[in-house]
């Protein structure tokens, strides 16, 4: 079954009663004031067709969803072994900002989608690029087909003001020899990436390359190889939703990536990319209503990688 606007709107109506049962991220002050009632879903087919319902054009802070794009950029700059000797490919089973395993495992983060792993990726970008923030924005604008996307300076500044834990993670990795650059410039880049403001439609278009073997919308050349696209989807399926990755795989059955801004992106390889947005989060930091909406959509259209 192919999603229709009516199907998507009906799913949003079904999950709307969940609003009020989660919690908007408040540890980043600039995000705490977001309306909890926002709810949207957008589907982008590999041919560029968009089907959407709800609040799909309003931009929000994508936060950890940006970790997929920063890893994509790193994959285009480094040989695989240069990346994977510094960050692992395993689920962590701990909170996204945990330091427990990092101490026990000699400063090597479990995967690139927890904070420690994303900071290593940001460190890699800082080592190889003269203007990493510019290159990241250039990539996202290209993938989304939207030249007007920007960083949210207020959100980035808010995160920098409350950066003690992320700085501690970076300094701990540096003490193990797994951080090449000065910590604060890398943190500045990292928070800028997280502050990207995008809509459901922007994100669905952006992630089309992972549904199409590395080929972005409207492009003639892949941005990562078919093999790398497959590997990225594997990582998203096992590590993309923090310590809720197993629950998401069980309920939704698609590779996915979440952010504490309330967005979740999911991939149906070979067919479509999907974005949902609902700012209230579950205890793992994933969108409560968004996960439920994706579960219903997967069931109704009969899609799963399992």
UniProtKB/Swiss-Prot annotation:
Coiled coil: none annotated. Pfam families: Glutaminase (PF04960). Its EC number is 3.5.1.2. It catalyses: L-glutamine + H2O = L-glutamate + NH4(+). One of its GO terms (molecular function) is glutaminase activity. Belongs to the glutaminase family. PANTHER family: GLUTAMINASE (PTHR12544:SF29). Homotetramer. This is Glutaminase. It comes from Photobacterium profundum (strain SS9).
